[in-house]
């Protein structure tokens, strides 16, 4: 049986709690496969863009029709839906990768980052207050933020292949 061929570029949304390992995974995955990696929150903070401006820049970048990863600014179902719609409008096939890590590990990583228990707690509480777990129709590819990059990559590739097969 011949596999289904999907010629659309992929827009990979990488989602997870702070210090879950999403940025580490996204950067390594992008480097391994020669993909662009964008962070909406970083675009807004470092360049002073509004969310709309950051999404417009992404829309311009999508004209390249190259598969890419994006993280940040996709913490709610509404934000992810907006991103999926933009990707589809630009001819991309969206996929959601959800990096999960237990809360104890996240808190430990945040304590190391901030060198303060109170600052770590404050940051975690603020960052997760509005966060919404993906719902079934989003079909997230779930990765552990504690697994090796090689294991994460195998799971991500398998999950992406499964999405193609399910169409």
Regions found by a protein language model. Name each.
Residues 43-44, 75-76, 100-105, 148:
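Conserved nucleotide-binding/hydrolysis micro-motifs of P-loop NTPases
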Residues 2-9, 61:
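Phosphate-binding P-loop
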Residues 37, 94-96, 140-142:
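Conserved beta-strand scaffold positions in the cores of enzyme catalytic domains, especially
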Residues 115-156, 160-167:
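Small-molecule kinase domains that catalyze NTP-dependent phosphoryl transfer to phosphate-bearing small molecules
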Residues 49-94:
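Glycine-rich phosphate-binding loop used to anchor ATP phosphates in small-molecule kinases
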Residues 88-110:
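Conserved phosphate-donor/acceptor-positioning beta-strand/loop module used by diverse small-molecule
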Residues 14:
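Hydrophobic anchor at the beta1->P-loop junction of P-loop NTPases
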Residues 17-66:
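Conserved substrate/cofactor phosphate-moiety recognition/catalytic segment
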């Amino acid at each position: 049986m011949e596999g289904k061929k999907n010629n659309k570029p992929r827009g990979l949304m990488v989602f997870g709690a702070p210090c879950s390992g999403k940025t580490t995974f996204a950067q390594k995955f992008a480097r391994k496969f020669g993909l662009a990696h964008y962070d909406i929150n970083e675009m807004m903070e470092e360049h002073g863009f509004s969310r709309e401006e950051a999404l417009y820049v992404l829309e311009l970048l999508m004209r390249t029709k190259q598969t890419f990863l994006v993280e940040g600014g996709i913490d709610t179902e509404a934000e992810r839906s907006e991103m999926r719609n933009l990707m589809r409008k630009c001819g991309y096939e969206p996929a959601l990768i959800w990096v999960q890590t237990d809360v104890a590990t996240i808190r430990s990583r945040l304590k190391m980052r901030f060198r303060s228990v109170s600052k770590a707690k404050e940051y975690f509480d603020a960052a997760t207050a509005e966060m919404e777990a993906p719902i079934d129709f989003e079909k997230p590819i779930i990765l552990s933020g504690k697994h090796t990059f090689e294991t994460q990559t195998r799971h991500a590739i398998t999950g992406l292949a499964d999405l193609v097969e399910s169409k």
